[in-house]
């Protein structure tokens, strides 16, 4: 029984899934916006928010924990120098997930996950 087991397996083994999360979080911080499937976006949201919280703490221990997870040293520097100070007054909710329809090849539901800095303006609905 899988009672109280949180998280999605996403059809991958543990090591593959963890590597994918590390790659996606690194890309999210490098580009500040990525397009992925709904399930992956929902899973990396919690990891990304924890990394930003580490960046807000800003001490050496937090830097080392983040560097052990994020794959590129330049992205760790960006997280601690530009991304984390942007959210020093915000107590969580650093990312936004926007649903963008389905993928052409397999109709998988797709989303954009981005860092909340720019104001979101929804498209005008056709009346």
From Swiss-Prot:
Subunit structure: Part of the 50S ribosomal subunit. Contacts protein L32.
Protein name (database record): Large ribosomal subunit protein bL17
Keyword Zinc: no
Cellular component, GO, one term: cytosolic large ribosomal subunit
HAMAP family attached to this UniProt entry: Ribosomal_bL17 (MF_01368)
Keyword field: Ribonucleoprotein, Ribosomal protein
Matching PROSITE patterns: RIBOSOMAL_L17 (PS01167)
Naturally occurring in which organism (per UniProt): Pelobacter propionicus (strain DSM 2379 / NBRC 103807 / OttBd1)
